[in-house]
Amino acid sequence: MKRCLNKANMTTSVKIVNKSNNALPAYQTAQAAGMDLSAYITEAIVLQPLQRQLVPTGLFIELPEHTEAQIRPRSGLAFKHGITVLNSPGTIDADYRGEIKVLLVNLSNEAFTIQSGERIAQIVIAKVEHAHFVEVEELSDSLRAAAGFGSTGK
C-alpha cells in the first residue's frame, strides 16, 4: 500500500533572527534531514590540532514546544579535515533564545582555518517526547538482556 503524505504536514515553522550576512539555513535537497550552518566571525579562526572553539553563527531561533534543534557535524569537514562537532549532537532546547554557536574541534594533525560564511555544521529540527520514569524492582527479560558494546556482532 502506497502512503501519500501531505508536504504541509511534514514541516515545522521556526522563528529565526539572522544577525549575520549569511543566507538562512536551507535544505539542499528534498530528502535532506539537516540544513547547513555557517560561521559568522569578524576574523578567521585558526583551529590548531586538538583545539576546540565555539564558533558563532549570528542566528537566533525560537523553536515550537516539543521540538529541539540538533547541531551535527558536516560529513565533508569531518572526513576531509578532521573537523567535527565536539558535543555531537549538540542540543538546543525549545526555550533557548541565545545565539547558536557551534563547538568545533580539530581532530587532525594540521591547523584548519575557518572563514566567515564557511559552512561548519548542520542543524536538524526534531520532535521531543518527554518520558515519565516508572521505578520498578526489576525489568522484564529480553533476548539481549544486559549484553552491550559489540554484543550483536562486529
Swiss-Prot record:
One of its GO terms (molecular function) is dUTP diphosphatase activity. This is Deoxyuridine 5'-triphosphate nucleotidohydrolase. Pfam families: dUTPase. The keyword Metal-binding applies. It is an enzyme of class 3 (hydrolase). It comes from the Bacteria. NCBIfam families: dut (TIGR00576), PRK00601.1 (NF001862). Its EC number is 3.6.1.23. The keyword Metal-binding applies. PANTHER family: DEOXYURIDINE 5'-TRIPHOSPHATE NUCLEOTIDOHYDROLASE (PTHR11241:SF0). This enzyme is involved in nucleotide metabolism: it produces dUMP, the immediate precursor of thymidine nucleotides and it decreases the intracellular concentration of dUTP so that uracil cannot be incorporated into DNA.
